[in-house]
A protein has these predicted regions:
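Generic detector of short, well-ordered, non-transmembrane alpha-helical segments enriched
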Residues: 35, 110, 128, 221-222
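Gram-positive Sec-dependent secretion signals
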Residues: 1-40
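Intrinsic-disorder/low-complexity regions
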Residues: 3, 25-27, 147-149, 165, ...
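A well-ordered secondary-structure block
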Residues: 38-56, 158-234
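Short, well-ordered surface patches within globular domains
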Residues: 44-172, 230
């Protein structure tokens, strides 16, 4: 899977859950399915269409309408519904219930966008969570992150093999994002609300042109360069 833009990151379980690791086993009937959560949402602005996303993925050319819609999407989607859970958690040692909570939160965002384009919702599966764990552990154990030149393909392949997936097809499983370092959060500790806020921003980035920059740069068209992640999620 070609990746033109690297998103912010220090790898964590939450980061893996925000991308392809959630979806890799989506059609595997051998995994257990839980209810889909539809709490948090992202609104797709007018001009953000399925045909525009397909066209970019086929030609690499974005229409002005798609770029403008992506700008609007980044600026107007500001309510993450992350709540006020200020309990600190170690992102490298999340409990299973915390992983499930973050997974379902992420799925609610992705599904809100899919549904607006007439696509079916994805559902949470334990097998996908196990795969996400294995991918995240490969990054963590081998001191890799999204700051590297590309995805950690050998680790992803090992995780795929351990999960009973095809490990010979290369990097087709992961869309990655992660956690920035800030003055408030500069260790592995985050609040659950902070994690959800970051996942919300990361999913917005993936949907809206791979936006890279600060709030003051959201009107800069040059900051919107790829919709491959959007094609993966949608």
């Amino acid at each position: 899977m070609r990746k033109n833009v690297k998103l912010l990151s220090t790898i964590s379980i939450a980061a893996a859950l925000a991308g392809g690791a959630v979806t890799a086993l989506n059609n595997d009937s051998s995994t257990s399915t839980f209810s889909t959560v539809e709490a948090a949402s992202i609104t797709l602005p007018s001009g953000y269409t399925k045909s525009a996303i397909i066209k970019w993925n086929q030609t690499g050319k974005a229409s002005k309408a798609l770029i403008n819609a992506s700008k609007k999407g980044m600026k107007e989607n500001i309510n993450s519904e992350a709540g006020n859970d200020n309990s600190l958690v170690n992102v490298t040692k999340l409990t299973n219930s915390q992983k499930v909570e973050l997974s379902k939160y992420t799925l609610s965002l992705i599904n809100s966008a899919r549904n607006q384009l007439g696509k079916q919702s994805w559902t949470y599966k334990t097998g996908a969570l196990h795969f996400a764990d294995r991918v995240a552990n490969q990054y963590y154990d081998h001191d890799r992150s999204c700051w590297d030149a590309d995805h950690y393909v050998p680790g992803i392949e090992r995780a795929a093999k351990a999960s009973g997936l095809n490990s010979r097809v290369g990097q087709v499983y992961e869309d990655e994002a992660g956690l920035p370092i800030s003055s408030e959060f500069h260790t592995n500790m985050r609040t659950m609300s902070a994690l959800k806020n970051q996942i919300y921003f990361n999913v917005k980035q993936m949907l809206f042109g791979g936006f890279s920059g600060s709030d003051s740069q959201m009107n800069d068209s040059s900051r919107y360069t790829e919709w491959e992640h959007a094609g993966d999620l949608l």
